[in-house]
């Protein structure tokens, strides 16, 4: 007696055996016999969906959960950066304490990389204003520019302070007190250099310092030095004249054939 509707044939092309107790693969949903139901025996193309492995942290030996489709190396790296309890990981977190403030980025750096426009801290990849969609306005000012502005403001404040002799009225003639005019605000560079260029102002300062350091020489000594210098120059000129005359009077050894 035959039962044609009982059982099913094996889906393996090389087998095709009629099995009365067929088995269904939970990965590819194929029907196989007991000999080919394993993933490796029928070369299942969907076996990777069931081959789930949980990576283990190499430092603390704790299993790290991984989402579907996420690389295990990335999950282990984030676990070491945030949740690992081992000594090397905790020491690393103490060094890399500057977290990037861009949304979605978890990178940490050893030093602060602050944006000059918005003032927030970012990692190396997102330190430029275009990389983190900077909301700050205007162009950033460098540290040298800020220092120059502060120096100019300091010079301007010192140049505009009135002297005590101008502000205090004279006690001898109180009736002749004149109304004081507001001080003029001049440029700190012009007030410092008196309208000269930088090279001229530097040369003028050097001349003044040399004049102050030079000792006062009596006028008689200056006259003696001048006379001595004139005598030396005259003797030098006379010697050169004698040398020129001796060279001109020297007979020439050249002869024309």
Curated annotation (Swiss-Prot):
Chain positions listed as propeptide in the UniProt record: 255-257
Zn finger (AN1-type) start-end: 4-52, 94-142
> In the UniProt record, which is one GO cellular component term?
proteasome complex
Q: Where is this region: Disordered?
A: 153-187
Q: List modified residues, type Phosphoserine.
A: 163, 173, 187
On whether Amino-acid biosynthesis is a keyword of this UniProt record, the answer is no
Instruction: Name where it mostly resides.
Output: endoplasmic reticulum
Determine the domain of life of the protein's source.
Answer: Eukaryota
Q: One GO biological process from the UniProt record? A: SRP-dependent cotranslational protein targeting to membrane, translocation
Q: Membrane topology for this entry? A: Lipid-anchor
User: Where along the sequence do coiled-coil regions lie?
Assistant: none
Q: Where in the cell is it found?
A: Endoplasmic reticulum membrane
* Subunit structure, interactors included: Binds 'Lys-48'-linked polyubiquitin chains of ubiquitinated proteins. Associates with the proteasome complex; upon exposure to arsenite. Interacts (via VIM motif) with VCP; the interaction is direct. Interacts with BAG6. Interacts with IGF1R (nascent precursor form). Interacts with DERL1, FAF2, NPLOC4 and UFD1; probably through VCP.
* Job description of the protein: Plays a role in protein homeostasis by regulating both the translocation and the ubiquitin-mediated proteasomal degradation of nascent proteins at the endoplasmic reticulum. It is involved in the regulation of signal-mediated translocation of proteins into the endoplasmic reticulum. It also plays a role in the ubiquitin-mediated proteasomal degradation of proteins for which signal-mediated translocation to the endoplasmic reticulum has failed.
Give the protein's recorded name.
Answer: AN1-type zinc finger protein 2B
Give the organism's phylogenetic lineage.
Eukaryota, Metazoa, Chordata, Craniata, Vertebrata
Supply the gene name. Zfand2b
């Amino acid at each position: 007696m035959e039962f044609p509707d009982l059982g099913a044939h094996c889906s393996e092309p090389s087998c095709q055996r009629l099995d009365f107790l067929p088995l269904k693969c939970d990965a590819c949903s194929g029907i196989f016999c007991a000999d080919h139901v394993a993933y490796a025996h029928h070369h299942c193309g969907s076996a990777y969906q069931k081959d789930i492995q949980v990576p283990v942290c190499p430092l603390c030996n704790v299993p790290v959960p991984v989402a579907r489709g996420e690389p295990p190396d990335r999950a282990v790296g984030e676990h070491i950066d945030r949740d690992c309890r081992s000594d090397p990981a905790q020491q690393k977190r103490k060094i890399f304490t500057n977290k990037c403030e861009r949304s979605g980025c978890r990178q940490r750096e050893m030093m602060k990389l602050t944006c000059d426009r918005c003032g927030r801290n970012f990692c190396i990849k997102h330190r430029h204003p275009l990389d983190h969609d900077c909301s700050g306005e205007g162009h950033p000012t460098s540290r040298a520019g800020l220092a120059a502005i502060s120096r100019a403001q300091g010079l301007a404040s010192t140049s505009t302070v009135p002297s005590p002799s101008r502000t205090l009225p004279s006690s001898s003639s109180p009736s002749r007190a004149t109304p004081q005019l507001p001080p003029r605000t001049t440029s700190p560079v012009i007030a410092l250099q008196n309208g000269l260029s930088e090279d001229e102002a530097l040369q003028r300062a050097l001349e003044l310092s040399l004049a102050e350091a030079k000792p006062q020489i009596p006028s008689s000594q200056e006259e003696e030095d001048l006379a001595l210098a004139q005598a030396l120059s005259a003797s030098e000129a006379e010697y050169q004249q004698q040398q020129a005359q001796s060279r001109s009077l020297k007979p020439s050894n050249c002869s024309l054939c």
